[in-house]
Amino acid sequence: MNLHMHLNFFIRSLGVVLMMNLILSACSVVGIRALEEPAYQTRMQEGSFEIREYASYLVAEVFMEGEDFDEVSGDGFRILADYIFGNNLSRSSSVQMAGKAEAASENIAMTAPVQMDQGKKPNQWRMAFSLPSKWNLESAPFPNDQRVNLREIPPEQMVVLQFSGRMGTQDLEEREQELRQWAMKQGIAVVGSIRTARYDPPWTLPFLRKNEVQLKVMD
């Protein structure tokens, strides 16, 4: 009888877990988001254009070499995903191994968006995941992969264009031109290269995706 009760409890628990995974997957397909994002205040909005004031936030970033956006984005995502899914050393916990305490790894909650922009060198690209706000440089799990760098982004003002659909190279060039023209019309001086921001996983229906291109406002 006890075994039968345990089996029933296990089956019900497994069903709940599978149902929750199904609901979360379905939400991501239709563009429903529940991920933490860097904190900001909107200073101005005109249609799909915004001026935002970002507070400082922490990122895990990786630099890659390649000729274009599409070529390197997959590699960068895998490296950063490996870090947040446990290829790291926790600074707050340890496990007991063979009679001595050793540092444990720690899973990190996924956040949004995934950022990408050009690096300072030719054919260099940077991809970044923002980390949950509960962490800072001293407390965030330390990357095992030396390609992953933790960095605090200082407060910054950005002009932003939000759009749905795909983010191919040609799409981004057109959106960048739109954003630069809007900033010029507003009398806003911008600096640096375009930054892309993806808020949804690749399997989200394209017309429901939340994408952005961003440019930093000159100090």
Where are the language model's segments positioned?
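A solvent-exposed interaction/effector surface
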Residues: 2, 6-14, 18-219
